């Protein structure tokens, strides 16, 4: 079994957290081909992303309280099993409607990894130390959005999109085996109350009444929604409007994702010195700057893919700072309800991302403006919410 505080455990948790970006980003180069194969519109194909986010959000409501009662490890293994079955259904889909439904169930299983990783970190760490651990996990897991679209582009070019989902089935089985053999159970004090709808709602009500929790949640959700504006629109804009091939799109998307790695690495170095809020503000500023730069690029009429990718890299660097600090700040007041706090956080965060991503997909046509405006709006919202809620967060720290 891996011991808490070791890099091996951190790497395993990073791998579990990477399920979300891996499952989303690996098939992005295939979106235009999926649309052509099923005779679907770009808006219909975007629903495979929105359905994933809705399923991801719903799963997070369930896993936290259940794991508070039954432990992290058995719940995690069950979630991975569902993920593998749904990924196989995606590969075998015969219509866009079947793919949309299968993606929702794929997310329902895949959400267990990120929810339970947050809860495991809270079992072991708290405060700035939890923020540092989540930043390190973010730095490692950031390899997923860098490598996934490149790998997805290669698979799409050589074999087609169905093989992409078969590869995810294999990755899921490998992850389940590693968890079964190496992951220790980190929950020492299990919830005494049996899991039921009233008990779950009671936990969420307690967590949701905390003003600091809501402040961190709003900041993080805004920044995360900007990411899904990019995910929803970039495949069609960069391939259909800017002329990139699937593999070239994968490389361009990966270059943007390097920004997240850089932001996570910066956060891990600075959080002990600047504190959660200092790094959070720096990240919010980067998100706003990246969004503004993307709007300026579209307004100037630039048609190079880098005119969108580089501003998004700045935005993602900000997200790499905001995401771990926002999660750690929200989770700190709830050592005895870490699972519930993580679940509610993830549900609302993913819901915001689903709405933003669907909106960009709906308005997307023969223009990059919906994409640029979606990213910029969320970037300025992130920084604005950081400024507007400083008092709430400061009072929470004093208490």
Regions found by a protein language model. Name each.
Residues 60-70, 263-276:
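Helix-to-loop junctions at the C-terminal end of transmembrane segments
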Residues 1-2, 186-217:
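Juxtamembrane intracellular "pre-TM" segments in multi-pass secondary transporters
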Residues 82-89, 97-105, 306-312:
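Paired small-residue
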Residues 37-39, 71, 92-98, 109, ...:
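Helix-breaking motifs and short loop linkers at transmembrane-helix boundaries and internal kinks
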Residues 98, 135-181:
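Helix-loop-helix hairpin linking two adjacent transmembrane segments in secondary transporters
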Residues 102-143:
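Cytoplasmic helix-loop-helix junction between adjacent transmembrane helices
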Residues 74-89, 169, 279-294:
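Structural signature of the two symmetry-related core transmembrane helices
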Residues 58-97:
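Conserved MFS/SLC helix-loop-helix module at the cytosolic interface between two early adjacent transmembrane helices
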């Amino acid at each position: 079994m891996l011991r808490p505080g070791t890099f091996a455990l951190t790497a395993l948790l990073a791998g579990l957290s990477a399920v979300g970006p891996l499952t989303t980003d690996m098939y992005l180069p295939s979106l235009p081909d999926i649309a052509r194969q099923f005779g679907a519109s770009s808006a219909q194909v975007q629903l495979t992303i929105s359905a994933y986010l809705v399923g991801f959000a719903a799963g997070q409501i369930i896993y936290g309280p259940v794991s508070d009662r039954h432990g992290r490890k058995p719940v995690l293994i069950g979630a991975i099993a569902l993920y593998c079955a749904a990924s196989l259904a995606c590969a075998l889909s015969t219509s866009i409607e079947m793919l949309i439904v299968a993606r929702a169930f794929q997310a329902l299983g895949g959400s267990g990894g990120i929810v339970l990783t947050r809860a495991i970190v809270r079992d072991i760490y708290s405060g700035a130390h939890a923020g540092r651990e989540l930043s390190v996990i973010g730095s490692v897991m950031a390899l997923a959005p860098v490598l996934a679209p490149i790998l997805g582009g290669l698979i799409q070019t050589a074999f087609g999109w169905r093989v992409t989902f078969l590869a995810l089935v294999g990755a899921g089985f490998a992850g389940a085996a590693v968890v079964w053999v190496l992951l220790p159970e980190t929950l020492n004090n299990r919830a005494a109350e049996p899991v039921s709808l009233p008990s779950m709602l009671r936990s969420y009500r307690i967590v949701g009444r905390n003003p600091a929790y809501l402040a961190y949640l709003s900041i993080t959700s805004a920044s995360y929604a900007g990411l899904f504006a990019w995910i929803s629109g970039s495949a069609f804009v960069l391939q259909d409007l800017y002329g990139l091939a699937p593999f070239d799109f994968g490389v361009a998307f990966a270059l943007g994702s390097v920004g997240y790695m850089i932001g996570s690495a910066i956060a891990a170095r600075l959080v002990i010195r600047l504190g959660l809020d200092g790094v959070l503000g720096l990240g919010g500023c980067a998100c706003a700057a990246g969004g503004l730069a993307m709007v300026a690029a579209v307004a100037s009429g630039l048609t190079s893919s880098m005119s969108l990718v580089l501003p998004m890299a700045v935005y993602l660097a900000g997200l790499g700072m905001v995401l771990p600090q926002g999660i750690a700040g929200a989770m700190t007041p709830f050592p005895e309800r870490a699972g519930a706090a993580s679940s509610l956080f993830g549900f609302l965060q993913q819901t915001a991302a689903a709405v933003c991503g669907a909106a960009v997909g709906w308005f997307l046509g023969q223009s990059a403006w919906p994409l640029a405006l979606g990213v910029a709006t969320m970037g300025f919202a992130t920084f604005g919410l950081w400024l507007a809620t400083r008092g709430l967060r400061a009072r929470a720290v004093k208490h």
